[in-house]
């Protein structure tokens, strides 16, 4: 919005040309989201407290968590407001990638909000059923995947429509352009063609998987938000590179026109995330809830798909991956041993993984900071793929 206003007035006020610089708008988007979060955070926490939107704590979990009972949850609303307002203020409204990322983020946030609302307001400990939640995640994920399959390699929605019609006329056999291939990190020119259906399936798995992985990681004060900020910031750098004809050519990446604008979104996400961490740091004054975790995970997955860095997201989000795998292994092993031996056995003291370390004697703050450090290292490895190819 501010970009359009500045471009309209820049002939009379030359200093407004600074708005044309993507890096300037990215910095301002981050600061705007940070100010919104810090400014409205206390009010949001008070309102959540007054509404008695308190977190329920499982009695069979770590005993140190019992003191957290009643802490306001659904604080992810604050993050989403910061992201949405800041992005819309500083982005180019004509950029199609911004809108699809916002759609996924707010759509998944809505799913999380309904789930949280049922849990804390209706006092339903189950919230949305797994089937219902998965259905709506699938609807949004498949819609985004289908659009991006034809959008990533094109420069406008008209070209997207033309590519889709060409695909239909070809009997659904038309191959997607090379820009839509799966990029393999650390190799200069190694990529795999996916085809339309392959692209849609991969995109769906990345978006839904990332959303649920971030949600599983959100279990300790400050644990999930810093990795989200770090990974999101790194994806913003990839977006800037892929959106630049100069940098993408120099670094041997496909040029994706319009992808650079996602730096605005990622910067807003970083600013909003840091503001939330101010209140979520141990001892937390507010919890994110599914409304924030599902949305942020979906956002990371969508951005990664657009900038063709699905594998790099898997690397940088290693903490999210480990948490998810720990749950899958725990459930699978428990069911297998129960069927074979008559009683279920556990691989971990408790899943997700952060609870295993807690029950192994690590303090909560140790788990959190050590997971942050691991994420920092993984993000640096991910960023190294820009040049080490």
UniProtKB/Swiss-Prot annotation:
Membrane topology is: Multi-pass membrane protein
InterPro entries on file:
Glycosyl_transferase_4 (IPR000715), PNAcMuramoyl-5peptid_Trfase (IPR003524), PNAcMuramoyl-5peptid_Trfase_CS (IPR018480)
Catalytic activity reported: UDP-N-acetyl-alpha-D-muramoyl-L-alanyl-gamma-D-glutamyl-meso-2,6-diaminopimeloyl-D-alanyl-D-alanine + di-trans,octa-cis-undecaprenyl phosphate = di-trans,octa-cis-undecaprenyl diphospho-N-acetyl-alpha-D-muramoyl-L-alanyl-D-glutamyl-meso-2,6-diaminopimeloyl-D-alanyl-D-alanine + UMP
Q: Would you name any one GO CC term?
A: plasma membrane
An example GO BP is: cell division
The record's keywords, sorted A to Z, are: Cell cycle, Cell division, Cell inner membrane, Cell membrane, Cell shape, Cell wall biogenesis/degradation, Magnesium, Membrane, Metal-binding, Peptidoglycan synthesis, Transferase, Transmembrane, Transmembrane helix
Keyword Hydrolase in record: no
Where does this protein chiefly localize?
membrane
Q: Where are the transmembrane segments?
A: 25-45, 74-94, 97-117, 134-154, 190-210, 222-242, 259-279, 286-306, 311-331, 366-386
Q: Which class of enzymes does this protein belong to?
A: transferase
As cofactor, the record names: Mg(2+)
Q: Where in the cell is it found?
A: Cell inner membrane
Pathway the protein takes part in: Cell wall biogenesis; peptidoglycan biosynthesis
Catalytic activity, EC: 2.7.8.13
> Which terms in the Gene Ontology molecular function aspect does this entry carry?
metal ion binding; phospho-N-acetylmuramoyl-pentapeptide-transferase activity; UDP-N-acetylmuramoyl-L-alanyl-D-glutamyl-meso-2,6-diaminopimelyl-D-alanyl-D-alanine:undecaprenyl-phosphate transferase activity
Q: Does the keyword Transmembrane apply?
A: yes
Function of the protein: Catalyzes the initial step of the lipid cycle reactions in the biosynthesis of the cell wall peptidoglycan: transfers peptidoglycan precursor phospho-MurNAc-pentapeptide from UDP-MurNAc-pentapeptide onto the lipid carrier undecaprenyl phosphate, yielding undecaprenyl-pyrophosphoryl-MurNAc-pentapeptide, known as lipid I.
The UniProt similarity line reads: Belongs to the glycosyltransferase 4 family. MraY subfamily.
The protein's name: Phospho-N-acetylmuramoyl-pentapeptide-transferase
Lineage of source species: Bacteria, Pseudomonadati, Pseudomonadota, Betaproteobacteria, Burkholderiales
């Amino acid at each position: 919005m501010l970009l359009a206003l500045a471009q309209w007035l820049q002939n009379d006020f030359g200093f407004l040309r600074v708005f044309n610089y993507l890096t300037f708008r990215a910095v301002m988007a981050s600061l705007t989201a940070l100010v919104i979060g810090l400014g409205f955070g206390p009010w949001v926490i008070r309102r959540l407290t007054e509404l008695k939107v308190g977190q329920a704590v499982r009695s069979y979990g770590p005993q140190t968590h019992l003191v957290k009972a009643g802490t306001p949850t659904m604080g992810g609303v604050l993050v989403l407001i910061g992201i949405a307002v800041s992005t819309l203020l500083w982005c180019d409204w004509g950029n199609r990638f911004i809108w699809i990322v916002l759609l996924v983020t707010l759509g998944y946030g809505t799913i999380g909000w309904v789930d949280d609302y049922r849990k804390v307001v209706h006092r339903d400990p189950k919230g949305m059923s797994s089937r219902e939640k998965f259905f709506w995640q699938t609807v949004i994920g498949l819609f985004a995947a289908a659009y991006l399959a034809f959008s990533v390699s094109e420069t406008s929605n008209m070209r997207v429509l033309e590519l889709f019609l060409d695909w239909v006329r070809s009997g659904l056999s038309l191959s997607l352009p090379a820009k839509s291939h799966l990029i393999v990190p650390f190799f200069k020119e190694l990529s795999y063609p996916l085809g339309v259906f392959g692209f849609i399936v991969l995109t769906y798995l990345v978006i839904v998987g990332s959303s649920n992985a971030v949600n599983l990681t959100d279990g300790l004060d400050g644990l999930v938000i810093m990795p989200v900020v770090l990974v999101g910031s790194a994806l913003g750098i990839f977006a800037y590179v892929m959106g630049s004809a100069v940098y993408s050519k120099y670094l041997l990446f496909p040029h994706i026109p319009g992808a650079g604008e996602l730096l605005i979104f990622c910067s807003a996400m970083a600013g909003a995330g840091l503001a939330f961490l101010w209140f979520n740091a141990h001892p937390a004054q507010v919890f994110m809830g599914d409304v924030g975790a599902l949305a942020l995970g979906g956002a990371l997955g969508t951005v990664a798909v657009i900038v063709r860095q699905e594998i790099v997201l898997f690397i940088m989000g290693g903490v999210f991956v480990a948490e998810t795998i720990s749950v899958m292994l725990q459930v699978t092993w428990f069911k297998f041993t129960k069927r074979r031996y008559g009683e279920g056995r556990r691989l971990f003291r408790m899943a997700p993984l952060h609870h295993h370390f807690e029950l192994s004697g690590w303090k909560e703050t140790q788990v959190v900071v050590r997971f942050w450090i691991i994420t920092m290292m993984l993000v640096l490895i991910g960023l190294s793929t820009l040049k080490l190819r």
